[in-house]
UniProtKB/Swiss-Prot annotation:
This protein's domain notes: The TPR region (477-578) is not required for assembly into the Toc complex, but interacts with TOC34 only while transferring the preprotein from HSP90 to the Toc core translocon. The amidase region (166-200) is required for the efficient transfer of the preprotein.
InterPro entries listed in its UniProt record: Amidase_dom, AS_sf, TPR-like_helical_dom_sf, TPR_2, TPR_rpt
PANTHER family reported in the protein's UniProt record: AMIDASE 1, OUTER ENVELOPE PROTEIN 64, CHLOROPLASTIC
Keywords: Chloroplast, Membrane, Plastid, Plastid outer membrane, Protein transport, Repeat, TPR repeat, Transmembrane, Transmembrane helix, Transport
Segments on the Chloroplast intermembrane face: 1-4, 166-403
Pfam family, one: TPR_2
Gene3D superfamilies referenced in this protein's UniProt entry, alphabetically: Amidase signature (AS) domain, Tetratricopeptide repeat domain
Protein transport listed as a keyword: yes
UniProt name for this protein: Translocon at the outer membrane of chloroplasts 64
TPR repeats: 477-510, 511-544, 545-578
Amino acid sequence: MKSMASPSSQIWVILGLGLAGIYVLTRKLTQAVKEDFGAFLLKLKLLPPPPPAPPKAPHPLSSLNFAISDIFDIEGHVSTFGHPEWARTHEPASSTASAVSALVESGATCIGTTVVDELAYGISGENKHFGTPTNPAVPNRVPGGSSSGAAVAVAANFVDFSLGVDTSGGVRVPAGFCGILGFRPSHGAVSHVGIIPVSTSLDTVGWFAKDPDVLRRVGHILLQAPFVMQRNPRQIIIADDCFQHLNVPLDRTSQVVIKATEKLFGKQVLKHINFEDYISSKVSSLKACSIQKSNGVLKSSSLKLLANVMQSLQRHEFEHTHSEWMSIVKPDLHPAVSAQLHEKFEVSELEIENSKSVRSELRVAVNSLLKDEGVLVIPTVADPPPKLGGKEFLSHDYQSRALSLLSIASISGCCQVTVPLGFFDKNPVSVSLIARHGGDRFLLDTLKTMYTVLQEQADIAAPSKSSKSVVSKEQSAEISKEKGNQAYKDKQWQKAIGFYTEAIKLCGNNATYYSNRAQAYLELGSYLQAEEDCTTAISFDKKNVKAYFRRGTAREMLGYYKEAIDDFKYALVLEPTNKRAASSAERLRKLFQ
């Protein structure tokens, strides 16, 4: 359809469906319509078959409405793929996507298609052609993408659930930013027939809901999983290191999960882990992905390397599928998308093969960690949703922080669910639960079991609006430091790191907190983090002897022997009687004479 229209015009069409009944649709031709929060691109009705006569049970999704991202095929309709040029250059679909058909056949009614990022490639939710959907949770901030409209449709209560596609966070990010549930299933668990591909080795059909029971019911239809008895998790593993660099306090994120777990299953189920260290030890192919190595030690964190692998795979596979169309049409793109697709990209076949090895090894590692009844807990996103029109998504640091967390499930192919936990500083807060590849039904069951208690604990953690703090930030920081010291004495290194991190969040210019956390990192063998913390401590206090000694120790373990000797010597300048610094400096001096 190639007709011109006035800014407020819409087109109503009645077409045959080929599923059941008929559908009526209306295309939004401009971004002027905002009564639907800008979520919908098409209004339509895909009607389910008539309900069976009693005493037969009704269809499992009867009375539920849903929307779909405009990346799924609908018979007789051209999906936009987030860009008007795509619709202009493609023919209408000859059939409806398998996932959509399955849901309609199960009794749900599809009422529309929703806005996606251009070419479904971004995670911001912004679209310069069809408009950026309004985030109902924080209207002055982006909704997250790529499945922005689908998330907004659920968050604004227009539908009971919606479908999106998650490649590198396309469902998980908007769920986190809009404060709703978002499920990314195991890779390959749901049919991709009738979906425009972004990156075939990363793409999954995902879905949003507010109600965990609805999320689960939809999952049972899409996953076609056989019935099994519901099982409680045997282990809930907190990835403590992933929570340490958030701007949200731990008592609003990981501590909420810990308290809910203790209440439901008991303390014995809980386990803490440094996930980066685990990945570094289990995914050997990551070493080949590092461009900066010293004595075999990675200078880039394992999660950042995973993010690089994910970006390379996504870009490589996207170009393999769509490069001809891109070169002919030359579509006008949002800067955040253009920056990723137009920057110079060269990757060898060897690098792609190594990326595939990383993917295989990571899946084995995560499956081995979680087994059949384990759950890994991580933050969904590293930062709150940026303000509309902000430049954060153009920042390499922002992208790296976000994609590092998102790469875990994308690369391993494991299933992940975003769980909202209220608000902090007026922005939605969420965590994510990950289960092994193929553990989708178990994860949906676990979410349903935990959801109410998680919300209760999140409410308890949120301060009352009428309450006033009677303890200063500095005092609270000191309390956290003392708790960290006690945990360190008890040889609970990861727990100590958590408390020192809390102290740093409350008072970020105290050298002692960084130096103490560095010592705990040394005990865990996390030498890069220890070196970084010591350097920060020294920047605040250039006479901090312990920081110099601890940095020297970290550098020695990393193989930076000259720098280590310099640190030990400077510690002796500050404290000539320091026997440990003297012996360390002498040992290295003799070694390299």
